[in-house]
């Protein structure tokens, strides 16, 4: 038995209207969104969401940022919203970075009238390359001996004090500056982004770098170890004029995009503001031995999360031999020297900066290196110095003379031979001694002759040179400087007026 529910007329009208509304609401399912559809960015831009976002606690809301660093070159227009800015640089070109004092009145009063130290670094942006940074930089050093990754253009810079560049850290420079005075530093980046790509077949994209600045104030001991502020920005480095072409290409591509597509990208700014980041962790594999004219004091900082801050974990350092204990010092490196003895020899001869590179090298391994090998490994300056040290080469003296002491017996033999034959004889046997002069002065010659005679220099009254017709010419600095190299002289001694002194005659 079938039941049928009879609705009143008014209810039928209501039901019909609800069905039509429901059908209309389902009619859009499966169709593509039109231009007038809502986008998520529009939804998030509604006041209710903005108010909710502003109510969230900000980590840096009450944080004092004492400084601001501005790279005076335009950012790329091809960077999407909510992404970090990207700036293109030309290889070897000088770019200005302005160091601005961002403190409010009364903030950090301990900096008033004081200098601060800033350390500039060019580091990798990609996490993968950060883990192998040391190997990457050593490979670059091998291919570009004598070159640096980062330099300061000192003549163009303003307000920087005591700029320094450690020869073992090619990507780092540092200087002191006064926040109360105008300070602008011009930097040059000499490596290009494509030098660190995995495959180099042409047309590949270069890896991005970061320019990071860490600033420190002076502690109670006068060392700049107390961290104040760190900031960085993302860059790509091209061959000369390549950055200008890339900027122009990005700008032309953006001009061809529709207004809706352009809204997804941030505009190109005239300058690049470095954003706050965590301090760069100390690189532990760098030798603690200071280079000439470079203060190698090291700081250790915790690694934290920050905007654009690389979470860099340096590889553990290789053990360095303590040269002060356990081994008898060796003067010359021998083929039989062990790797430990080779490390000791490197430290004693001021090659500690390269000790890690030669950790497993024995004496034979080092001595087999050619001149080109050590120059490629250590650069031209240190490479030539290491090669000369390995080969035991001494510095050639400025002047070498040979002298022989004329004895009474030889003088009598010569006189007798002359009397018998009527001429000077050459049968006498003379033994000469070499005298090496560096300063080429009369005082230096006096000291060297005194050593030869095993007497005090004060016992030599005057030194003469026998001239034409047997005259005695007083030796002076100018005369010694005009001696021919490897000249030969016979030394004759004459008793001076005083009992304990002598006159020396060079014949």
Curated annotation (Swiss-Prot):
GO terms for cellular component: nucleus. GO terms for molecular function: DNA binding; DNA-binding transcription activator activity, RNA polymerase II-specific. Residues 241-265 have a biased composition (Basic and acidic residues). It is found in: Nucleus. Gene3D superfamilies: Transcription Factor, Ets-1 (1.10.150.50). Pfam families: CP2 (PF04516), GRHL1_C (PF25416), SAM_3 (PF18016). InterPro entries: CP2 (IPR007604), SAM/pointed_sf (IPR013761), SAM_3 (IPR041418), TF_CP2-like (IPR040167), TFCP2_SAM (IPR037599). Its main location: nucleus. It comes from the Eukaryota. Residues 133-395 are annotated as: DNA-binding. Keywords: DNA-binding, Nucleus, Transcription, Transcription regulation. Residues 240-268, 296-316 are annotated as: Disordered. Residues 61-300 form the Grh/CP2 DB domain. PANTHER family: ALPHA-GLOBIN TRANSCRIPTION FACTOR CP2, TRANSCRIPTION FACTOR CP2. May function as a transcription factor. Belongs to the grh/CP2 family. CP2 subfamily. Component of the SSP (stage selector protein) complex, which appears to be a heteromer of TFCP2 and 2 copies of NFE4. This is Transcription factor CP2.
């Amino acid at each position: 038995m079938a039941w049928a529910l009879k609705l009143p007329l008014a209810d039928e009208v209501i039901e019909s209207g609800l069905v039509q509304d429901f059908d209309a609401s389902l009619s859009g399912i499966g169709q593509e969104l039109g231009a007038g559809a809502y986008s998520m960015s529009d939804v998030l831009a509604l006041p209710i969401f903005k108010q909710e976002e502003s109510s969230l606690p900000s980590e840096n809301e009450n944080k004092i940022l004492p400084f601001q660093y501005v790279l005076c070159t335009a950012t790329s227009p091809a960077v999407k919203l909510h992404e970090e800015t990207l700036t293109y640089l030309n290889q070897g070109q000088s770019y200005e970075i302005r160091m601005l004092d961002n403190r409010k009145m009364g903030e950090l009063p301990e900096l008033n009238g004081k200098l601060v130290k800033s350390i500039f670094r060019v580091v990798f942006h990609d996490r993968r390359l950060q883990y192998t940074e040391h190997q990457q930089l050593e490979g670059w050093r091998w291919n570009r001996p004598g070159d640096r990754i980062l330099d300061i253009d000192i003549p163009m810079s303003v307000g920087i004090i005591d700029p320094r560049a450690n020869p073992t850290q090619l990507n780092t420079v540092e200087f002191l500056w006064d926040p109360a005075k105008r300070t602008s530093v011009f930097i040059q980046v000499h490596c290009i982004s494509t030098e660190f790509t995995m495959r180099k077949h042409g047309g590949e994209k270069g890896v991005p770098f970061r320019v990071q600045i860490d600033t420190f104030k002076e502690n109670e001991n006068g060392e700049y170890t107390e961290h104040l502020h760190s900031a960085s920005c993302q860059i790509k480095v091209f061959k000369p004029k390549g950055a200008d072409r890339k900027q122009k290409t990005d700008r032309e591509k953006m001009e061809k995009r529709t207004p809706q597509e352009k809204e997804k990208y941030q505009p190109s700014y005239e300058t690049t503001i470095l954003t706050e980041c965590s301090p760069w962790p100390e690189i532990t594999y760098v030798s603690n031995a200071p280079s000439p004219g470079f203060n190698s004091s090291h700081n250790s900082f915790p690694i934290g999360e920050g905007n654009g801050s690389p979470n860099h974990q340096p590889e553990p350092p290789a053990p360095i031999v303590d040269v002060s204990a356990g081994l008898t010092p060796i003067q010359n490196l021998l083929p039989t020297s062990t790797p430990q003895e080779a490390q000791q020899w490197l430290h004693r001869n001021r090659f500690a900066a390269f000790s890690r590179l030669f950790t497993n090298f024995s004496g034979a391994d080092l001595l087999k290196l050619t001149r080109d090998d050590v120059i490629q490994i250590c650069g031209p300056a240190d490479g030539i110095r290491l090669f000369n040290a390995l080969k035991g080469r001494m510095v050639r003296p400025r002047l070498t003379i040979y002298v022989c002491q004329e004895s009474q017996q030889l003088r009598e033999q010569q006189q007798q031979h002359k009397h018998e034959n009527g001429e000077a004889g050459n049968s006498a046997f003379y033994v000469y001694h070499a005298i090496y002069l560096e300063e080429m002065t009369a005082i230096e010659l006096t000291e060297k002759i005194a050593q030869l005679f095993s007497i005090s220099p004060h016992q030599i009254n005057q030194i003469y040179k026998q001239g034409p017709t047997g005259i005695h010419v007083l030796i002076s600095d100018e005369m010694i400087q005009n001696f021919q190299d490897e000249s030969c002289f016979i030394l004759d001694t004459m008793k001076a007026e005083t009992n304990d002194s002598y006159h020396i005659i060079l014949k």
